[in-house]
């Protein structure tokens, strides 16, 4: 790794530790030329499957799109941003665990609904009403009744 201070090529690792949930390694490094110390974080590059939309168009998984959809459903609800980020990480892990190169948007939507159901029931209903295209109040009532079972 190049030194960020003098751009030297030779640096050495002086300390390594697991951080977060064990998915990151924090390394303290020292430049062998200028002796400055700096920290790096190492994470595995894990590829998420492509998403197959309802019109059969394939596109890369878009974490920002997932986040926006969840935050829209959770707007003005008492859910912390840490909880949202944890849910997003869990959804991404579930998608990776499929081992598939491509997954349908329906699978992603169902994972989001499961996560929202755990986080906040009102947000779940908001998301489900758009995702499932509720036509009338009866469909809202049926979904609420299923939540209460």
Curated annotation (Swiss-Prot):
Transmembrane segments: none annotated. PROSITE patterns: ATP_CONE (PS51161). GO terms for biological process: negative regulation of DNA-templated transcription. Residues 49-139 form the ATP-cone domain. One of its GO terms (molecular function) is double-stranded DNA binding. InterPro entries: ATP-cone_dom, NrdR-like_N, RNR_NrdR-like. Keywords: ATP-binding, DNA-binding, Metal-binding, Nucleotide-binding, Repressor, Transcription, Transcription regulation, Zinc, Zinc-finger. Binds 1 zinc ion. The keyword Transmembrane does not apply. A zinc finger (unnamed) spans 3-34. Its cofactor is Zn(2+). Negatively regulates transcription of bacterial ribonucleotide reductase nrd genes and operons by binding to NrdR-boxes. Belongs to the NrdR family. NCBIfam families: transcriptional regulator NrdR. This is Transcriptional repressor NrdR.
């Amino acid at each position: 790794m190049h030194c960020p201070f003098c751009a030297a090529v030779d640096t050495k690792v002086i300390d390594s530790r697991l951080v977060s949930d064990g998915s990151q390694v924090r390394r303290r490094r020292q430049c062998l030329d200028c002796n400055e110390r700096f920290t790096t974080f190492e994470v595995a590059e894990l590829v998420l499957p492509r998403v197959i939309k309802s019109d059969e168009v394939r596109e890369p998984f878009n974490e920002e799109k997932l986040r926006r959809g969840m935050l829209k459903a959770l707007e003005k609800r008492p859910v912390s941003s840490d909880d949202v980020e944890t849910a997003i990480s869990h959804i991404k892990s579930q998608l990776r665990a499929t081992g598939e190169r491509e997954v349908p948007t329906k699978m992603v939507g169902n994972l989001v609904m499961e996560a929202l159901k755990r986080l906040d029931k009102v947000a779940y209903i908001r998301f489900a009403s758009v995702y499932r295209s509720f036509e009338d109040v009866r469909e809202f009532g049926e979904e609420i009744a299923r939540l209460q079972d």
